[in-house]
Design a protein with these regions (language model features):
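Short beta-strand-to-loop capping motifs
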Residues: 4-10, 61-65
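Amphipathic alpha-helical segments
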Residues: 6-24
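Short, surface-exposed beta-strand/loop "edge" segments at domain boundaries and coil↔beta transitions
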Residues: 13, 38-41, 64-71
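Residue-level detector of functional hotspots within protein domains
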Residues: 18, 25-27, 43-47
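Surface-exposed, low-hydrophobicity interaction/linker segments
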Residues: 21-39
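A short, structured beta-strand/loop element
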Residues: 33-53
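C-terminal structural segments of small proteins and small subunits
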Residues: 54-84
Length: 84
């Protein structure tokens, strides 16, 4: 399964989230692994201009369905509950 989405979250916050997960391994600065799921973070150009420019990242998760859904759910709840 592949899940690929754009989020209005800074790449630093996304990295910090994955680094805090005890069952996630960091392969490189923007690549993580959870069980069979590979997670790639890509920083995108901000959307908007000036002080209204929102930081954006692309989050790509690829692996077995259960693993992708499990780590995605944890990520989604973290950033949804904090407003991004």
């Amino acid at each position: 399964m592949i899940k690929e989405e754009t989020w209005s979250v800074s790449i630093q916050r996304a990295r910090a989230f994955f680094r805090e997960q005890e069952d996630v391994t960091e392969e490189s600065i923007n690549c993580f692994v959870y069980r069979t799921c590979r997670i790639a973070l890509t920083e995108l150009k901000p959307k908007g201009m000036g002080i209204w420019a929102a930081k954006r990242i692309q989050v790509r998760m690829e692996g077995e369905v259960a693993d992708v859904e499990h780590i995605y759910h944890r990520y989604f709840i973290q950033f949804l509950s904090t407003g991004g």
